[in-house]
Each structure stands twice: as structure tokens, then as C-alpha cells.
Amino acid sequence: MIYSIYEIQQRIAPVAKQYGVKAVFLFGSYARGEAREDSDIDLLVDTSGTNLRSLLSLGALYCDLEAALQKPIDLITV
């Protein structure tokens, strides 16, 4: 399935809120409108001001985002 940007936003918003994430930015093929069925979803997440510093907490965020999207993701945090 290929999601619209709106669908991605709706799926990740509850997860971002749960973790206190300041902002999530979409980049890559989905942001360019070039996504294919096999495309992953590339996300940059602003975790400043949160307690998301340990590998365990970042792994939980990754898993929850991937579960919400039901597609593989690439996650970059700042």
C-alpha cells in the first residue's frame, strides 16, 4: 500500500504525542511523491527535550512507529 502524506500524518501523530516528540519530518520517496509499493518511509524525529536517549527507548519509538504505519521505516533522530 502507498500512503498519502495525510495518512502518514494521521498514523504517526498518536505515537509522536505518546513519546512527547516535538516534530516529525518526512523525507525521501514519500516526501517527493515517488513512493512505490516496496518503499520504506523515511522519518526524521526531533527528540530534543524528551527522555528518548537510551537505545531501549529509541527502539520502542521505532517499533511503535513501524507498527502504526505497517511498513518498514528508516528513522533518524535529532
Where are these regions (language model features)?
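A generic local structural motif
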Residues: Q10-I12, S29-A31, L61-Y62
